[in-house]
Amino acid sequence: QKELVPSKTTTCCGYSPGTMCPSCMCTNTCPPQK
């Protein structure tokens, strides 16, 4: 692994393995969506 890179197909930046997530999730800059 490297640093906080948006691994959309592998791991959600170490949060949820095998889960797709936007790059903003890595840098914690995602706008609140409900």
Swiss-Prot record:
Modified residues annotated as 4-carboxyglutamate in this record: E3
Keywords attached to this entry: Disulfide bond, Gamma-carboxyglutamic acid, Glycoprotein, Hydroxylation, Ion channel impairing toxin, Neurotoxin, Pyrrolidone carboxylic acid, Secreted, Toxin
Organ and tissue specificity: Expressed by the venom duct.
GO MF annotation list: ion channel regulator activity; toxin activity
Modified how: Contains 3 disulfide bonds.
Domain of life: Eukaryota
Principal localisation: secreted
Pyrrolidone carboxylic acid modifications at: Q1
Family in the record: Belongs to the conotoxin A superfamily.
Function noted in UniProt: Probable neurotoxin with ion channel inhibitor activity.
Domain notes: The cysteine framework is IV (CC-C-C-C-C).
Entry protein name: Conotoxin S4.3
Source organism of the structure: Conus striatus (Striated cone)
